[in-house]
């Protein structure tokens, strides 16, 4: 497959984009660039990893998180469907679940405890509606706090925000 990376590079890194991939440097809120890219490329699938991830910050500035994590995701989903995309992979989070002393499973009760988790749950629920209405096939990846990246590979945050720095 040919890969196109659509990234504002606000927190991303150009050097992480493979040489054989096409980079479109634009924000998801730029609907003109987004629509142009989606219609020009005729994608088989969209993999959506863009989001603010700092749960604590989401409680200090919720509007910023709702705008970036949910509203921009909705725009991407809607425009992808309009462009004929049939498959969508969404980078969600385990933060959509209620806090629990028990191990979590796919059947665990939903109940985010912060705005970050809520924006991810809203996006998952939106994808389910687009599946029902438009036939969009999707997968939501519900990560836990990641750790264990190899030196020189993986994520790069300044400042580092994970419990176990990558």
Task: Spell out what each predicted region is.
Residues 30, 163-166:
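Alpha-helical structural motif
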Residues 112-119, 156-164:
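The catalytic Tyr-centered alpha-helix of NAD(P)H-dependent dehydrogenases
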